[in-house]
């Protein structure tokens, strides 16, 4: 059966590819429009590109601490170099010992491997407590053990070279770059100049430069006396050690210039010491940086709320701090899995939450759907700058314009005031003077009022007050109920017994029957009386007619 080749993609990378493919099917997004929201106290402060980073890639940088002097100048620089060499050994020997203890704690036998590793870590940590980060750093140090051993095999050739930067590839499993900040100085100052320098000047120049570099080394490794091998080095520390030569390694690892500044600010580029050789004064550091995937159709929009005026007092809008928009979909973005820089978000995973229809409608520009909470105090800063203009609550503070002079008043019912250079060039707020350079064009909505129905109670103190009012209402109701019970208690219970009720019902029925019979009898008697009256009237009329007839005869 023939062999079958297969390509296995790491799960995080597959997740990244799927997300990017899914988002590529959605129409490109536009930034959340903050113009209709500004007058409602909701300010869009900026956008950041969303990136997802997965498993890290590594490379080694071998720092050559001791420079090689030109043959004709070795004698002049001998004294400062020897003093520098002794100081280096004193400073970095604890680091080398710590690295060796951790690397030697793990052998090929499986039984007590983990126990020996933890024991070695705790042995090099103050107070005998190993953090998760230190255990992770120790594990990375163990994984780099073979690479460090391969570098040490080449230490003589690395130490002998006069090149400031060169790649080391022989027998190494990952990219390694040997750099020498001091070698760069020697090459620039002595090897590439035709100017003859006297021995005293050479000694002074070398001594000063070596002292400066020792200061940088002390800054990098000084705070790590307790566990020097287990503390990560920041990108700033790496640049202090390697100088500008650090860029060479990062470029070789695939970091572009457009990405470099953002990654440096993120703190995702770190280093861990993996070897120190006092004989050749070589320091090996494994540099770790992330694999970054850019989500082209996704950006994070940051929202800030301003305390606005309402008929119920000062309130702030209930909206998420960060939202993301892809096409027509707007959702809240959880940034707890992300690292922020000035322009980018680097996330290990993308987590969003759907918003209620009211908040969605609010952020889409329907400010009448926005809800507000009475949680902002009177000491909250009542203004915010936006693109050279100011959004201020001029009911909470005095908006004094110095050019042209005057007081900017806020109309009754208006949430906030939008102030730009068209209305004021120099604005004073709480003693702070601002020169305005921006404008709110006609697309910005103004004179927005917050209705009473839009203000709800969410703060602890306000809820306590409302609960107090509810408790008072309940107490009043209980008082009324108690008063009613006292009146009911005065009722004769004997009159409300079952037998008494039956008697009352029976007598009531008899009374009703008697009443009906009396009514029928009365009607009959009235009818009979009227009949008798008609008979008597007829007899009278008949007798009168007979008398008239007799008289005529």
Curated annotation (Swiss-Prot):
Glycosylation site residues: 85, 191, 366, 447, 471
What's an example GO BP annotation here?
A: fusion of virus membrane with host plasma membrane
Which interval of the chain is the signal sequence? Answer: 1-31
Annotated transmembrane regions = 501-521
Location comes to: Virion membrane; Host cell membrane
In the record, which residues receive a covalent lipid, type S-palmitoyl cysteine?
Answer: 523
A cellular component term (GO) from this record?
Answer: virion membrane
Q: Which residues form a coiled coil?
A: 142-170, 466-491
Q: Which UniProt keywords apply?
A: Coiled coil, Disulfide bond, Fusion of virus membrane with host cell membrane, Fusion of virus membrane with host membrane, Glycoprotein, Host cell membrane, Host membrane, Lipoprotein, Membrane, Palmitate, Signal, Transmembrane, Transmembrane helix, Viral envelope protein, Viral penetration into host cytoplasm, Virion, Virus entry into host cell
- Location of region: Fusion peptide: 117-141
Q: Which residues lie on this side of the membrane: Cytoplasmic?
A: 522-553
List the Extracellular topological domains.
32-500
Q: Which gene encodes it?
A: F
Family named by the database record: Belongs to the paramyxoviruses fusion glycoprotein family.
Disulfide-bonded cysteines = 76-199, 338-347, 362-370, 394-399, 401-424
Site (described: Cleavage): 116-117
| Domain of life where this protein originates | Viruses
Query: Would you tell me the protein name for this molecule?
Result: Fusion glycoprotein F0
- Description of how the protein assembles with itself and partners: Homotrimer of disulfide-linked F1-F2.
